[in-house]
Curated annotation (Swiss-Prot):
CDD domains: Ribosomal_L7_L12 (cd00387). This is Large ribosomal subunit protein bL12. Forms part of the ribosomal stalk which helps the ribosome interact with GTP-bound translation factors. Is thus essential for accurate translation. It comes from Ectopseudomonas mendocina (strain ymp) (Pseudomonas mendocina). The keyword Transmembrane does not apply. The keyword Ribonucleoprotein applies. InterPro entries: Ribosomal_bL12, Ribosomal_bL12_C, Ribosomal_bL12_C/ClpS-like, Ribosomal_bL12_oligo, Ribosomal_bL12_oligo_N_sf.
Length: 123
């Protein structure tokens, strides 16, 4: 049975950010490709170098704050980790919660964690 593009997109849309990151890594390994965007040719010699904007972000839990239970729930939601693993990450902050996210996905993850009471950094 073959899936339509719409079915694939719908299935991906129901996954968490961390599940999508894992899917991308698996696809890169399976097909021997990278998901990195193609790099355009650099400026001509003598031209001023353009400042390159960061495209991949890591979400770092700096501190759990007072609402530790809410932060653990948010970490579980974002990562798909079990209760024990999420609690260990929160208890041993600072910890990287998600790696290689787009700016929008990283800001969404940061917002969820901050709403739960955590202090978060994007790197």
């Amino acid at each position: 049975m073959s899936l339509t593009n719409e079915q694939i997109i719908e299935a991906i849309g129901q996954k968490s950010v961390m599940e999508i990151v894992e899917l991308i890594k698996a696809m890169e390994e399976t097909f021997g490709v990278t998901a990195a965007a193609a790099v355009a040719a650099g400026p001509a010699a003598g031209a001023a170098a353009a400042v390159e904007e960061q495209t991949e972000f890591n979400v770092v839990l700096a501190e759990a704050g007072d609402k530790k239970v809410n932060v653990i729930k948010a970490v579980r939601e974002l990562t798909g980790l079990g209760l024990k693993e999420a609690k260990e990450k929160v208890d041993t902050a600072p910890q990287v919660i998600a790696e290689g996210l787009t700016k929008e996905a990283a800001e969404d993850a940061k917002k969820k964690l901050e709403e739960a009471g955590a202090k978060v950094e994007l790197k």
